[in-house]
Regions:
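Class II aminoacyl-tRNA synthetase catalytic cores and aaRS-like
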Residues: 1-422
């Protein structure tokens, strides 16, 4: 006899075994008519509570939290379903699952502050590679594999960002990224629609915790998804037209900064710190477009970002305009970003220029992209036109299950609970 059903409330003696005949009482309770003595297999030294009402206890003793609350276990089962679905989906389309380095001398692939550590086996001299960083994204490693001749690759794994903690952010989290040679932005959108609509349909049929939440929230994942243009929507919301030198700010950054700072003052919006062009445009998006994204109960695709916001994406001249836009989209559901995807920049010359422009911002913004000379050297061997895509697994599970905190969908909770976990 084992499992939670055998342990009732109050003081439990532990996990026991018994041989007998399974039957039901007159009231329908499942029972065992013992034909042998009960044998204690493992003692329990504490009374098992009916519930844990103290939030600190729940976060710092995840073991007991999961033991007591079936709803917490249901979320982890839902997470396992999502991971299995993703692997099956990509494998069925000839994607190769790979594992790329978590430790390296330079964390790249995203704008974020990395965790830093040291490797004693590599030496501690000033010219050694003893200083290591935990990856903030697997992107640059996966694109190296595309260069190596693997046309379709994907990876599901942890990434680490030394940043703030809140209901939707944890320094350690899980992503799924894929890269496909010769895939266009339209291909990425079509695949995203197929993946998410299929995932939700299957989950509603097979995972009760997800079915209950999807119906309660009124979410609809039927394709095609709604598309929203970044620049035209922002201009409509603000009642103005941005000058080309702002949208082409990678070429005229200082003038763009001053224009945007004056605009922030007029609009009464606090200037982000640091006040780079990318940060300010991103802030305007959150302020004006964010409410539009948050009001929809269907997936919304935000696309045609200014070039400066996407240093790793291929860019092109906007139709009928004199500014350039990134071949990129983000997908939002209920105001929360789930997917980031774009056509990858595959020119080593253009990529170096974009890295160098980001390096100027790095003087005031520690999270700006650093120049990865190793990746640039790999690009010299020829990166074919490639589409790249990433989704946050934790946020996806939160959305599907209705979990309010990212710690609820992590096996042992967020970092605050992991540190000092009982």
């Amino acid at each position: 006899m084992s499992g939670l059903e055998s342990r009732g409330s109050g003081y439990a003696e532990g996990i026991s075994s018994v041989t007998g005949i399974v039957s039901r009482t007159r009231t329908g309770e499942l029972s065992v008519r013992a034909t042998s003595e009960i044998k204690l297999l493992s003692p329990c030294l504490h009374p098992i509570p009916l519930t844990l009402s103290c939030e600190q206890t729940r976060s710092h003793n995840r073991t007991v939290n999961l033991l007591v609350h079936s709803a917490a276990r249901d979320i982890l089962r839902a997470r396992a379903f999502v991971l299995t679905y993703l692997r099956t989906f990509f494998s069925a389309r000839d994607f190769l699952e790979v594992q790329t380095p978590i430790l390296s001398d330079l964390a790249g692939g995203a704008a974020a502050r990395p965790f830093v550590t040291h490797a004693t086996v590599l030496g501690a001299g000033p010219d050694s590679l003893s200083l290591l960083e935990l990856r903030i994204a697997p992107e640059l490693w996966l694109k190296r594999l595309i260069i190596s001749g693997f046309d379709r690759v994907f990876e599901i794994g942890q990434v680490f960002r030394n940043e703030g903690i809140d209901a939707t952010h944890n320094p350690e989290f899980t992503t799924c990224e894929f890269y496909q040679a010769f895939a266009s932005l339209d291909d990425l959108i079509s695949l995203t629609e197929e993946l998410l609509s299929g995932l939700v349909k299957s989950a509603v049929e097979k995972v009760p915790a997800i079915k209950t939440n999807i119906y309660a929230k009124g979410f609809k994942f039927d394709a095609p998804f709604l598309r929203v243009d970044f620049i035209s929507t922002l201009e409509e919301c603000m009642g103005m037209t941005f000058p080309d030198f702002v949208l082409n700010s990678s070429e005229d950054s200082e003038d763009a900064k001053q224009f945007l700072k004056r605009l922030f003052a007029v609009e009464g919006i606090p200037i982000p710190n640091p006040g780079t062009v990318a940060r300010m445009l991103d802030k305007l998006c959150d302020y004006y477009i964010g409410p539009i994204l948050g009001s929809a109960k269907t997936p919304v695709i935000l696309m045609n970002f200014p070039e400066v916001l996407s240093p790793l994406a291929k860019s092109a001249k906007a139709d009928g305009k004199d500014y350039r836009i990134a071949r990129r989209f983000e997908l939002y559901v209920d105001g929360k970003e789930l997917v980031n995807a774009y056509e990858e920049e595959n020119s080593p010359f253009v990529q170096r220029r974009k890295f160098e422009l980001q390096l100027r911002d790095r003087e005031v913004d520690a999270e700006a992209h650093a120049t990865d000379e190793g990746y640039l050297a790999s690009m010299e061997w020829g990166l074919p036109p490639t589409g790249g895509w990433g989704i946050g697994i934790d946020r996806l599970v939160m959305l599907l299950t209705g979990a309010e905190r990212i710690s609820d969908v992590l096996t042992f909770g967020g970092i605050k609970g992991v540190v000092g976990q009982e």
